[in-house]
Amino acid sequence: MGMQISSEGVVVVELPDEPETTKELENIMRCVEDQDGCDVVLDFSNVTILTSKSLAPLMLLRGLLNTYGRRLVMCCINPATKGVFSVTALDAAFEIVEDKAAALALVEPHADRSDSP
């Protein structure tokens, strides 16, 4: 799919559907380590279902970001996948918002700071 790294230390990723989701989450963890920490926005637009195989790397990513004091925000999650988070009570463990704009607003609250004198 696509991974974009901004100059503000934000990685935005359009996750692929299963079975590639787990591999992409592992790639994101390597990227976070290479960046010495960054905020991550995961766009689930292309994910039709999330399997238990992807939940473990997702939790590991959240833990890694916590060690750096950074955020993981997930967006564009379809109802079936939201159901997986709800049933497993993981919806309380993650920041989940409706769309990418809302996710970016959480991790880039001062995106206009380059315009400041």
What are these regions (language model features)?
Residues 29-32, 40-41, 53-55, 60-105, ...:
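Amphipathic, Lys/Arg-enriched alpha-helical "gate/interface" segment within cytosolic domains
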